[in-house]
Amino acid sequence: MSLFDWFANRRKSHPVTKAQPEREISDGLWSKCESCGALTYTKDLRANQMVCLECGHHLRVTSDERIAQLIDAETWVAMDNNLVACDPLQFRDRKAYCDRIQEYQSKTGLQDAVQTGVGELDGLPLALGVMDFRFMGGSMGSVVGEKLTRLIEHATQNRLPLVIVCASGGARMQEGMLSLMQMAKTSAALDQHRTNRLLYIPVLTHPTTGGVTASFAMLGDMILAEPKATIGFAGRRVVEQTLREKLPDDFQTAEYLLSHGFVDAIVPRPELKRTLAQLIRIHAQMPMASDVSPAAVPVAAAVE
């Protein structure tokens, strides 16, 4: 038997098995940084609030994770969890809007793209809204606008500081004009909150764009942003095509907006809770924060 025949027979009797594929990174044990590609033990990454230990890149977090990062344990009381979007326009693109809503509700466990409620931050009571980009890109429709408006009105009546963590692609196109009117509705509610000289701090995370940027995201007394967050109204390519000129590489980043006076501070996520607590305490010591009686603003929300 030739050597060639021996190898051929051996291959038949001992077939070569395919190498086992590498273990998926998404199994939960390790996480890969979207910026530098570093592999980090997920437990360590979560301990650092989903900020890369190598390059400082801020990975996206869910609204539940954000609430846990900011609110003291066992103090969170959610509001208006029963609100669900309807489909007045009977909108359909590749699938019906109502089917798309149900799909995202199943994927995220949320009713819509924002969670609202009250709780304590470092022992300080406040009203908090947290947008979740996982739910249709954090787009603002009727439910998001209504929940935020009720939250703002609740904060006004109860003289609470207000924090809204923004993460959105803008207005929800599937609701047409009904989504656009939420910009005016939330802005009007914030004007009442401001008239009562109460503190409102929006926190702009990646990304904050479109109708959210053009409304409540930019109406704060102090506007904070996470490092390297994309913040703007229209997309970069749209702006370049409209202006017909090349934009700076850092255009529409938190750092660019800070240098041009559109945000007041860039705060790394691990320092956010401490920074918010400091700002709330400073505002509480100001005479104007306690000398004004609450305005008679109707409050539609009831804490569940």
UniProtKB/Swiss-Prot annotation:
Gene3D superfamilies: 2-enoyl-CoA Hydratase, Chain A, domain 1. Acetyl-CoA carboxylase is a heterohexamer composed of biotin carboxyl carrier protein (AccB), biotin carboxylase (AccC) and two subunits each of ACCase subunit alpha (AccA) and ACCase subunit beta (AccD). Zn(2+) binds at C33, C36, C52, C55. Its cofactor is Zn(2+). Its main location: cytoplasm. SUPFAM superfamilies: ClpP/crotonase. Binds 1 zinc ion per subunit. A zinc finger (C4-type) spans 33-55. It catalyses: N(6)-carboxybiotinyl-L-lysyl-[protein] + acetyl-CoA = N(6)-biotinyl-L-lysyl-[protein] + malonyl-CoA. This is Acetyl-coenzyme A carboxylase carboxyl transferase subunit beta. GO terms for cellular component: acetyl-CoA carboxylase complex. Signal peptide: none annotated. Keywords: ATP-binding, Cytoplasm, Fatty acid biosynthesis, Fatty acid metabolism, Lipid biosynthesis, Lipid metabolism, Metal-binding, Nucleotide-binding, Transferase, Zinc, Zinc-finger. GO terms for molecular function: acetyl-CoA carboxylase activity; ATP binding; carboxyl- or carbamoyltransferase activity; zinc ion binding. It is found in: Cytoplasm. It holds the Pfam family Zn_ribbon_ACC. The keyword Lipid biosynthesis applies. HAMAP family: AcetylCoA_CT_beta. The keyword Transmembrane helix does not apply.
